Amino acid sequence: MLHIKIVAVGTLRDEWQRLGCEEYKKRMGAFCRLQIIEVPETKLPKNAGAAQIAAALQAEGRRITEQAKGSGLVALCIEGEAVDSQELSQKIQRFASNGTGSLAFCIGSSHGLSDEVKNAAVWKLSMSKLTFPHQLARLMLCEQLYRALSITAGTPYHK
């Protein structure tokens, strides 16, 4: 069975987001083993400079790659490939059929992901050209992963 990790910087603050992610995790249990891993966000002052932000991204990147170890790392980033739900389903299936038994979808902080994480990625994925709060992106990713796995399984969720 495919193992999917969502490695996200920071915690979900709102109950509705947590409940939504838990619901999709429960639904995905029929298709894969989903693990949601939260890594600590590096605290920065409000007026943080570029060097401080870069250092924070590197520290977060180390925590992300440690949790993603042994998995094909998928970086969610603005410069990634934008796909529709069918294409996401096909991409996940290609990884699984090529022997990638575990995928780690990585969501950065509000400052994004470090270059090290992006360079280590087997795939860079963009959710949209729009900007979303990273907590909402996590819920949206859960829904899209469920949709993609439902497409592969041939269940009627995706219309």
Language model features with spans:
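Structured adenosyl-cofactor binding patch, chiefly the S-adenosyl-L-methionine
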Residues: 111, 115-159
